[in-house]
Amino acid sequence: MTTTAIYGVGAMGGAILDGLTAHGEGEVLAVARTPERAAEMRERYADRPAVEVVDAAVAAARADVHLVAVKPYAVADLLAQVRDYLGPGSVVVSLALGVSLADLVTALPDGVAAVRAMPNTPARVGQGMTVLSPAADVTDEQLQLVREVLAPTGGTLVLPEVQQGAATALSGSAPAYFYLVVEAMVDAGVAQGLTRADALALAGQAARGAGAMLVETGEEAALLRAQVTSPGGSTAAALARLEAHGVRHALADAVATCADRAG
């Protein structure tokens, strides 16, 4: 059975940890930054025996797959701290934005594989997507192991490292775009007389259903949109207002800006 270590249990690391422990199998070693955070983690996961809160050296020595979820500025110090404890054949997966494969390979000892990854927070509920970019010497078996470890958190997609910026814009940061849209819809629903709870239930399920339609049918978004849009109807009128306000252009600009920052 695979042992997975998670270094850093903030927003992203915590989401991955929750996804793994709620839906997966195997031992999970959680490494917190401070003793206070470690105590908090022990209390939070007291009912999940698969989770053990340990220090970084212990996690490095025991784990097969190492998920590095600390802030980008802290990656180099963490890897320097654990490199002498990492076992040959183990895999280090960095979730830190902007930390390149070259940086990882340089920081790791020979025989330890490096993978750059970008997950997203829906991993917490098993509906995430993690984009993986393996170093050249990562074996098919090691990459498959990483995919199996992350499977409880959602899907995985393997892309070359040069596409990590675009992937971040379309996946890593994308939940925030949808939350903003739903937030605006809920506010508008309240203005139309709905309670906030009812507006959130309606808009949230619409977002969930639309996402499922895209993934499960494999059809283009434009085709699915057309199926909902009757000529001269209320949906067509609403979409015309969105186009008039430049929503399509704003989204394209947001994605490009995010990709530039993340690349």
Name the predicted role of every residue range.
Residues M1-A57, A61, V190-Q192:
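NAD(P)+-binding Rossmann beta1-loop-alpha1 motif at the extreme N-terminus of oxidoreductases
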Residues L29-V31, V93, V115-A117, L157:
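Hydrophobic/aromatic beta-strand patches that form the interior of the parallel beta-sheet core
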Residues V31, R116-V131:
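Active-site capping/gating segments
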Residues R44, D103-A113, M129-A167, Y179-T217, ...:
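Internal alpha-helical scaffold of NAD(P)-dependent oxidoreductase catalytic cores
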Residues D55-L108:
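Rossmann-fold NAD(P) dinucleotide-binding segment
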Residues G204-G263:
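NAD(P)-dependent Rossmann-like dehydrogenase/reductase catalytic/cofactor-binding core
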